[in-house]
Amino acid sequence: MPNVVVVGAQWGDEGKGKIVDLLTQYADVVVRFQGGNNAGHTLVVGGEKTVLHLIPSGILHPGKSCVIGNGVVIDPEVLVLEIDRLKAKGALKDDGQLVVSLDAHVIMPWHKAIDVAREQAMGEGKIGTTGRGIGPTYEDKVARRGLRIRDLLDEARLARKVKERAALAREELARLGAKLELDEPALVKRYAELGRRVAGYATDVSIWLHRALQQGKSLLFEGAQGTMLDVDHGTYPFVTSSNTVAGNAVVGCGLGPTAVDYVLGISKAYSTRVGGGPYPTELKDETGERLRKIGGEYGATTGRPRRTGWLDALALRYAVRVNGLSGIAMTKLDVLTGFDTVKIAVGYRLDGKVLDEMPSDPEVIERCTPVYEELPGWTEKLEHLRTWDDLPPRARAYVKRVEELAGVKVVGCSVGADRGETILVENPFLAR
């Protein structure tokens, strides 16, 4: 069986969790490789909703292993809370199901304080951070002063590092006009306890995954956020603090690029974005509100209403290119039911010219207006449909047009919130 990477092809919130949950039955191991608990996966199985922020979606499948790689930043309070909630639901019966990298960096209280203080200091220039300390934790990682999961397992080492790093954090917060109220001995005690709680799951993930591959096991890499939020390839600076594209899948868990056989991009049938930054197809009218209401477009992590708009083919084609997408899974196709017409942005108008590729400068993107192609809508409900041929002709025509514009095949469509409400045209794990 091949190894498959699943990444967001838009601005995040594309429904990756549902698709990963669906594909997990074909994989042996699900791997999370970047981001932190700023991402939220909402899964609906048998009508029961589960929201996960750190642990991979595949944990709801008995017998599957889930790995949190070195590229993820971990809030140990959140990790332990998710473990406890899953156990209370009857999931994670076998502790061997969850594997956590010893080298994953740890979100500390000062990271959250710095995150919030900086955002407040930016005023109208706010990026729209979740305030969960993700960015400052990645900064400390790059500056070679971060704490890792392995540091929580040695209380003396933890105490030394907390003392050093807390002093630096207080200095930075003072410059921002904020204070860090911290009882260092109590903090060390608490995080050492958290370390003991996760110690049984922590290991060298690179070795663990390499052995899994040697045993012939198949891997499913689960991305967080989306392509347009990638720190290098997104609409910088309105991005997240990690690489969200497929190339980071192996870097974030300690494998080489030859471990990947197929890259699946997830895209909504329309588009959404959370936080600031350019968004050419944004709808600030009744249509945008209608998409938000029908699609339930509120953040799984923050509860913030998402910005909504029509599908942007230029952004999608960009995602195909920078990820090397093998195929696309389209989610929330059912949300478009009932619209008289549906639109796709096929170009940008800028200074009297029409562009057919997304500019690399976000300030230029901000000045662009979309050139739309309109297609007839459909009125039929889609939730009960399970095959491609069952879809209404106009819905099929819409999907095929997206396929033509993106340049890769749409291999699946989500027609409802539940795991089973999905049409899989081509299974990435069976593709050759």
From Swiss-Prot:
The keyword Nucleus does not apply. Its main location: cytoplasm. It is an enzyme of class 6 (ligase). It is found in: Cytoplasm. GTP binds at residues 12-18, 40-42, 306, 332-334, 414-416. Its cofactor is Mg(2+). Mg(2+) binds at residues 13, 40. Pfam families: Adenylsucc_synt. GO terms for biological process: 'de novo' AMP biosynthetic process; IMP metabolic process. The active site is at residues 13, 41. Substrate binds at residues 300-306. Pathway: Purine metabolism; AMP biosynthesis via de novo pathway; AMP from IMP: step 1/2. InterPro entries: Adenylosuccin_syn_GTP-bd (IPR018220), Adenylosuccin_syn_Lys_AS (IPR033128), Adenylosuccinate_synth_dom1 (IPR042109), Adenylosuccinate_synth_dom2 (IPR042110), Adenylosuccinate_synth_dom3 (IPR042111), Adenylosuccinate_synthetase (IPR001114), P-loop_NTPase (IPR027417). One of its GO terms (molecular function) is GTP binding. It catalyses: IMP + L-aspartate + GTP = N(6)-(1,2-dicarboxyethyl)-AMP + GDP + phosphate + 2 H(+). HAMAP family: Adenylosucc_synth. Plays an important role in the de novo pathway of purine nucleotide biosynthesis. Catalyzes the first committed step in the biosynthesis of AMP from IMP. Belongs to the adenylosuccinate synthetase family. Homodimer. This is Adenylosuccinate synthetase. It comes from Anaeromyxobacter dehalogenans (strain 2CP-C). The lineage of its organism: Bacteria, Pseudomonadati, Myxococcota, Myxococcia, Myxococcales.
